[in-house]
Amino acid sequence: DYHKAVDNPQAPTLFAAIHAAEWNKAVQITPSFTLEKAECDYTDPATLFPHGIDVVYFDAFAPEKQPERWAEEPLRRIFDAMNPGGVLTTYCAKGEIRRRLQSIGFVVERLAGPPAGKREILRATKPQL
């Protein structure tokens, strides 16, 4: 629940810690949450891509503006790098993107977007083995 998370008294401190975390380095945010922000070009097949990913916040511009970011092959690379049960979220809720994520193997749900923002968002989960 969005409001429950935002109303958490620790939210501002956690938010700041997440954004201040160094790139390409594991940073412990809480005792049960370690964040490693990976800076890499997932659209380039030659790029070494991290594996063992649990969460992807996919914030590319719209498919019309950055079609290479939404192509099947780069999205498949993300899927392949994720752990079973890993979650990808995106503000893009277009049907073509939902169907593409499903065809790659994700289980995709439409969720209500945040207040004063997008009407819907997508949550794509890599199935457990």
Predicted feature descriptions by range:
Residues D1-F49:
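S-adenosyl-L-methionine
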Residues L35, H51-A60:
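Short SAM/SAH-binding signature in class I
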Residues E36-A38, T89, E109:
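Hydrophobic/aromatic beta-strand patches that form the interior of the parallel beta-sheet core
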Residues V55-Y57, P84-C92:
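Conserved beta-strand signature within the Rossmann-like core of class I S-adenosyl-L-methionine
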Residues E64-Q66:
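Short glycine-rich, flexible loops that bind phosphorylated cofactors or substrates
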Residues E68-P84:
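A short glycine-rich, Lys/Arg-flanked "PGG" loop and its adjoining helix->strand segment in the class I
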Residues A93-I104:
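Short alpha-helix
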Residues I104-L129:
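Core SAM-dependent methyltransferase catalytic element
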